[in-house]
Amino acid sequence: MWPPCGAMRNLALVLARSQRARACSGNERVSYTQGQSPEPRTREYFYYVDHQGQLFLDDSKMKNFITCFKDLQFLVTFFSRLRPNHSGRYEASFPFLSLCGRERNFLRCEDRPVVFTHLLASDSESPRLSYCGGGEALAIPFEPARLLPLAANGRLYHPAPERAGGVGLVRSALAFELSACFEYGPNSPTVPSHVQWQGRRIALTMDLAPLLLAAPPP
């Protein structure tokens, strides 16, 4: 077990105990107790990520910047191990799972499990998008041509690691900054056709649309 796993477990236990480890129904469809042990030497915890990329214990009554997880090592460990939940437990309600030894960390999300929060500029490399509070440790190359503005909800999406669903949400503040680079055609006033980036006019591929629209709602 990596050192961060112990920190993850201990922090979750403290928070769960502070809430009296109550049984809860995070989305009105499933009951659980934070830190429950369905099998010997196995613990289960339940998390939620919002549209700003903030991670919380799922049963937290108050979800805001003060109550979200901020420890970098914890966030990197959690999100770098995120996978689709094929465990046979809570699959419908918590579609993603982060394993840490015998610790199961189930995740549900407001929109997508990966939320891009910052565009990291570099003099020597192409820009990278950082997600879910992980800084440089959780970052992928920025692909401006593959940005997907979705008119149905007014949100912006970008490719994400395949293990985390392949599509990530761009946080609203960052999406607003990037929207200044969009170019709209005369026949499409609501959906951009190109993006102006680093002196180039780049056509948007829209190739993420089938993958995003085919995904079940969280």
Swiss-Prot record:
<protein>
    <recommendedName>
        <fullName>UPF0598 protein C8orf82 homolog</fullName>
    </recommendedName>
</protein>
<dbReference type="Pfam" id="PF14956">
    <property type="entry name" value="DUF4505"/>
</dbReference>
<comment type="similarity">
    <text>Belongs to the UPF0598 family.</text>
</comment>
<dbReference type="InterPro" id="IPR028108">
    <property type="entry name" value="DUF4505"/>
</dbReference>
